[in-house]
Design a protein with these regions (language model features):
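Glycine-rich, acidic loop segments that terminate in or are immediately followed by a histidine
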Residues: 82-184
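A structured phosphate/pyrophosphate-recognition subdomain
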Residues: 1-80, 87-89
Length: 184
């Protein structure tokens, strides 16, 4: 396979994966049933890419969502971490994990949490441990009803009344002393 085809397939996989993010089907750029119907007639994904506008449409949506997140106003810069709070909007729910990965790559020495506000007064969030020391995200998230992997984890249903408690725990979760005898 040539590198151009490999790139196209990677981009298609990333776009389809991105389309799965959100809290409900209404948040998605393309309904999964419609996505299936668009893909199903093609036995070769490269033919699908060449014959439809699905890939560029999803790439555009992802780019637009990231641009909206980058323009957000509410950011709390804590001692060892950065807390980003996104609004109650479909684009914010779609971009939450992707944006967490982006800010983690841009500032690998810090931990990052991206929370989206919900209409019910609760937050859903993606937490990334510092890329320079990728551990502890799972431990933090379990304290707030979430779970995940050591470097990347999430929470659901964080009550607004607990936001400051989460911010305080998040601020200290990734400092050197929190690692115990093993250190960083």
């Amino acid at each position: 396979m040539n590198s151009s085809d490999e790139r196209k397939l990677r981009e298609l996989g990333e776009a389809i994966n991105y389309n799965a993010y959100g809290d409900s089907v209404a948040d998605l750029a393309v309904d999964p049933v419609d996505m299936y119907r668009a893909i199903q007639p093609y036995s070769d994904p490269l033919d699908f890419i060449a014959s439809t506008s699905v890939l560029p449409e999803l790439q555009t949506r992802r780019t637009e969502d990231l641009e909206l997140a980058l323009g957000l106003v509410e950011v709390r810069r804590l001692a060892n971490a950065t807390l980003h709070i996104l609004p109650d909007a479909a684009w914010a729910r779609r971009v939450r994990g992707d944006f967490a990965n982006l800010v983690a790559r841009r500032d690998p020495a810090r931990a990052h949490a991206v929370l989206t506000a919900g209409a019910d007064g609760r937050y859903t969030g993606s937490v990334r441990a510092p890329l320079d020391c990728p551990r502890g995200a799972d431990v933090l998230c379990r304290k707030f009803g979430g779970n995940g992997r050591v470097a990347a984890a999430g929470i659901e249903g964080l009550d607004r009344a607990r936001l400051d408690e989460f911010a305080a725990a998040f601020s200290i979760a990734f400092c050197g002393e929190s690692w115990g005898a093993g250190g960083r």
